[in-house]
Amino acid sequence: MTNNAGLIWLIGCKGMLGTELSRLLEKTELPFVGTDREIDITDMAALTAAAEKQPVRWIINSAAYTAVDKAEDDAEVCRALNTRGAANIAAIANNTEAKLIHISTDYVFDGNGNRPYREEDETAPTGVYGLTKRDGEISVLKNNPRSYIIRTAWLYGKHGNNFVHTMLRLMNERDEVKVVNDQRGSPTWTFDLASVIITLIKTVDSGKEIPFGVYHFTNEGNITWFDFAKEIYKQGREQGRITKDCAVSPCSSAEYPAKVKRPAYSVLDKSKIKTALGIKIPAWDESLREFIKKQ
């Protein structure tokens, strides 16, 4: 790591969000360094040694264990990364007097709601992944009060496996795809989330006081996965990314049993972050159109 005053340290720089953040940070005047698996976030000594190599004023933690079903059989590893790793990073931030941005998830809720979840709503995770992320949030705020936790949902982007990539591939291979129509949420393009993270940093750096704590961010609007798939097909055909006819059919979650029940409703209320930063969040279908255009 370079010895450049006021660095942003991006942890998890090779993940789906981290790769997008790296790309956007490179276009700013903000000095940053990115690390990934070469530094074990479960190893406090390794984190401490890395932190001592440069002055850090911001840490972004986009590292996480995100395999929701696999986590049920891999609970110790999941907890090590999502809870202990998050706690370690927060402690490092506190020791270096850095501000922390920690990425979390809609899975901290049980998905039984009927209105968009607010930041202060009671959490009730139903699986190992959600539980470890919820416990990670608690540890972050305990270990470093100068933390921003951003919960997001239905994340997709250029890098890594995600729903949009899967649908584009399947729709070019099959005559029909079946997609669940009883789970409602809001897609999030990594470009939009990465952009708002950078906006948060720049806003705080400018001297504006943005209260620490939990914030929600997704794209605007809420839909089912079936709705999402239909729009992917529509946009894919219009933009030449899908070159054959493919029927998109609805089905129930019961037809695709999984180890962990997916949230039936995971819409997040974004009023707090919109007010705090004075931002307008793009609609989910607008962002999807731009994403497919860039593929």
Question: Predicted regions span which residues?
Answer:
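NAD(P)-dependent short-chain dehydrogenase/reductase
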Residues: I138-T199
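N-terminal Rossmann NAD(P)H-binding glycine-rich loop of SDR-like oxidoreductase domains
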Residues: G6-L25
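Adenosine-cofactor binding site in Rossmann-like domains, unifying the SAM/SAH pocket
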Residues: E26-A49
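NAD(P)H-binding glycine-rich loop region in Rossmannoid oxidoreductase-like domains
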Residues: M44-T83, I92
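Mid/C-terminal beta-alpha module of Rossmann-like enzyme folds, strongest
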Residues: T203-P257
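Amphipathic terminal alpha-helices
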Residues: G6, A283-Q295
